[in-house]
Amino acid sequence: MKLEPMIYTNDIANSIKFYRDTLGFEIDEYYPNDETPTWIAVRIGNDRLGIGRTFPDIKYKLHPRGVDGSGVQFYIKVTDVDEFYEKFRNKVEIIDDIENKSWGDREFTFKDPDGYLVSFYSKIK
């Protein structure tokens, strides 16, 4: 069994640009194709994050989205968080600057184009 979170966007092209071009993640899958995708899977290490638009044939209602993707935060564990901070600090809008946290992580946080929170962290040695 494997958990694969799914987030929704109104602008899939902007999400592709952000996750692939800005963050450097691999797009593992495009649906229905890479020219006009309505859904993508972003590879982050051994995990995937689905990003897509809703489809008319989905029979259940998605909960209304809060302000800027509120309620969702992705934590990405890396070996050297300072290296990732230097790589991304001029490419994304940092909302919580890099620092050691009381719970034993060194981390920084930014928002993706839809307002979902993304944090990179390393354990404090």
Predicted segment positions?
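Vicinal oxygen chelate
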Residues: 1-6, 26-76, 85-111, 122-125
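Conserved active-site tyrosine of GNAT-family acetyltransferases
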Residues: 15-20, 88, 112-115
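Generic secretory/membrane-interface signal
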Residues: 13, 20, 99-101
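Short, conserved beta-strand/loop elements in beta-sheet-dominated catalytic cores
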Residues: 116-120
